[in-house]
Amino acid sequence: MVKGSVTNTSSIVKQFEKSSIKHETETIAFAKQFINECIREFQEQKDNVVEEKNTDQNHQNQNQEGVIIEIYQELLQKVDLISSELRQNLSSLQLRFQEVERDTGHDLLNVLNSLSQEARLAQKVLEEDGSQQGSQLIQGLLTCFQSTGN
């Protein structure tokens, strides 16, 4: 009973950790890919600005500055979206960890209560049999369980 509960809880925690790591890795990979695409787009725009600047200096500079500003604004918006998504994911992870901790703690308390009840029953059986050493052993176990339960 105890091993099953602990194994089940351990399995849930491991599955959650794997899922969290996978999601985090995917999010980081997406962010890196996005940043690389933005850098590439920016470099292309920069190259275009240099080419056009040589042909029509004044007019092209004004147009390209506007394009660069738009690109920067789009980049900032995308970075804000990624940041927001990462904050949401972190919040979700924190909630899931709290749920696992709460469930695990509840399971452990149930196990301790069950063990305490079984120890009391064993003490009654030993007291009826008159075994002094067994009774002392069970009394010691009860004391241990009661101190860990508090």
Curated annotation (Swiss-Prot):
Residues annotated with Phosphoserine modification: 11
Traits of the deletion mutant: Abnormal linear element formation. Abnormal sporulation.
Record's keyword annotation contains Phosphoprotein: yes
Oligomeric and partner information: Component of linear elements (LinEs), which are similar to synaptonemal complexes, at least composed of rec27, rec25, rec10 and mug20. Interacts with rec10; the interaction is direct.
Name assigned to this protein: Linear element protein rec25
Localization annotation: Cytoplasm; Nucleus; Chromosome
Function: During meiotic DNA recombination, binds to and may help activate DNA double-strand break (DSB) hotspot sites.
Main location: cytoplasm
Taxonomic lineage: Eukaryota, Fungi, Dikarya, Ascomycota, Taphrinomycotina
DNA repair is among the record's keywords: no
A GO biological-process term: chromosome segregation
Species, as recorded: Schizosaccharomyces pombe (strain 972 / ATCC 24843)
Highest taxon of the lineage: Eukaryota
Keywords: Chromosome, Chromosome partition, Cytoplasm, Meiosis, Nucleus, Phosphoprotein
Example of a GO cellular component annotation carried by this entry: nucleus
